[in-house]
Amino acid sequence: MCRVTGFRRVLFRSQLIETALLAQVNHQSLIATKTRRIVSAAEGRAVSDFGARRAHNMDAAVYGARAAYIGGAVGTATVLAGQMFDIPVSGTMAHSWVMYYKDEFEAFKHYAENYPDGTVLLVDTYDVIGSGIPNAIRVAKEVLEPMGKRLKGIRIDSGDLAYLSKKIRKMLDDVGLEDCKIVVSNSLDEYTITSILQQGGKIDSFGVGERLITAKSDPVFGAVYKISAVEENGTFAPRIKISENVEKITNPGLKDVYRIYDEAGHSVADLITKAGEKVDMSVPYRYADPVKPWKNRSFENCTAKKLQQQVVKEGKRIVEPESLEDIRAYVEKQLNTEVWEEEQRFENPHEHYLDMSPAYYEMKMDMLHESRTR
């Protein structure tokens, strides 16, 4: 949750930033989330962002690459993103390189001579098994090995990736190229990657494009920006938006948000309280479930961590920005140590609980009841 405070005399300034703030937060949160799902499906294999040409525009490509790196991608093929954010840049040859030459072997040979330390050959321009792999092997043996170099990898961008990767792995291993990596691309996402690996695909890394950079399966991240309180005579009076849809009813007033952890350090819920309200976890802490208010529940043997941190004061940044590497490491730590595996399922994930302190819940219910008389 992000809180933006603007006093009545400058309220319009808070309103002016709404679109820009939501555009940045929604887009990059969406791409980082999608990337994390893809990275999880890859089960430790490298995932790279190959999506620039299918992004909605260049800003989406560049900032999408940044978000993908935060989400766990090891690099991007978008060179500008690499320059702007110091993200590792990776990529392979294009089909146009192969097609420019009359002979596939000549195309591979010239590429290897130009990039001997990182030769990854695209083998599906004509016939993966019939010509692509044989020519790649020939380049490895006749061009690279005499230079003291090894063929770094091959890439396939079409066909049955599970079947082809198994055939290719055997062909490479049979000629002593066990260290040659197999890179695959072609409309990949977490579901296709899971399926390929379940079928025994022999793949070392994935280049993921359109379905990552557009989050094709679920292309909207629905964060909203709503007024929750208005300054009146030096204090903030809560405001609530009522809706025909219960999920669109806003949470009123100034508030604090705490993350609640069990003894093992797992996050069990987030807790909304009134701003400044004391949260004492030394004794069982009763809370209100806004979805199932009839349930009488409490947190026991838990700890609470306040999530909000003031970043801007009187228009000035008061906290140094975190590096991209620090942000990426924070995401990795959160997902590996604090978030339950059940909450990270691709299908029907367990929902992370969002609860309320009794005082906050009572305030919200009072405002809902009062709204009936208006």
Predicted segments with their positions:
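Residue-level "edge-of-site" marker
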Residues: H95, S185, G209
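Buried, small/hydrophobic-residue-enriched core segments of structured protein domains
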Residues: F7-E178, L188-T192, Q198-Q199, N233, ...
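A generic, residue-level signal for flexible/boundary positions that often mark functional hotspots
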Residues: T5-G6, I182
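Gly/Ser/Thr/Ala-enriched C-terminal appendages of enzymes
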Residues: V175, L188-R374
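Short hydrophobic alpha-helical runs that function as membrane-insertion/retention elements
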Residues: G91, V183, D204-G207
